[in-house]
Design a protein with these regions (language model features):
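Flexible, solvent-exposed loop/hinge segments and secondary-structure transition points
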Residues: 30-180
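Bacterial N-terminal signal peptides
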Residues: 5, 12-27
Length: 180
């Protein structure tokens, strides 16, 4: 009988290996992951919100809107803006998008000794804000003009422009944002 038992054990092992091999060899279906993206209409909505806020405050500004990777989607430099403001606005937007946080937080971290943020390609000046939809960063806006307080306020207002409730984490009906 020991031979039969060994054969039965070997048979069970072979069946188990066969089942596992079948499972691992089955075709795998790709899962579709839907990712929100900021389209041109959405970028223009954010840009327009920033421009209108800046005009109401009589605060000429350079305004940049970027995608999550920091690539420029929309830009405007208002009249009477200092020449350096264009580059500052773009870099503030890129930093906010790539780090997925307002540049004000980065400036605060540096001011409190977190010098790791003092690296190349990080703009540690206030005025950059991520654009969030359903908690997901779909882009960012950067504003450079008169003062860091004004830049921050304009950027935060513009970042909330795609949300009907003014909250940057709210649900929207696809206005300016599409699934990719």
């Amino acid at each position: 009988m020991p031979t039969v038992k060994t054969t039965a054990s070997t048979m069970k092992l072979a069946i188990g290996v066969g089942i596992l091999a079948t499972i691992f060899c089955l075709p795998v279906r790709a899962q579709t992951v839907s990712k929100l993206t900021l389209d041109q209409a959405g970028a223009q909505t954010v840009l327009q919100s920033a421009r209108e806020t800046a005009q109401r405050r009589n605060a000429p500004s350079a305004i940049a809107v970027v995608d999550p990777a920091g690539d420029l989607l929309a830009f405007q430099q208002m009249d009477r803006v200092r020449p350096a403001s264009a580059d500052l606005a773009i870099e503030k937007a890129r930093t906010a998008a790539r780090l997925q946080r307002p540049t004000a937080e980065i400036e605060d971290n540096i001011n409190h000794g977190r010098t790791a943020f003092v690296t190349a390609d990080i703009m540690a000046l206030r005025g950059g804000a991520p654009i969030r939809v359903n908690g997901e960063v779909v882009g960012a806006v950067g504003v450079a003009g008169l003062s860091k307080e004004t830049d921050t306020d304009i950027a935060n207002t513009a970042a909330a422009a795609l949300s009907p409730t003014g909250e940057t984490h709210s649900m929207i009906d696809g206005v300016g944002v599409g699934a990719k």
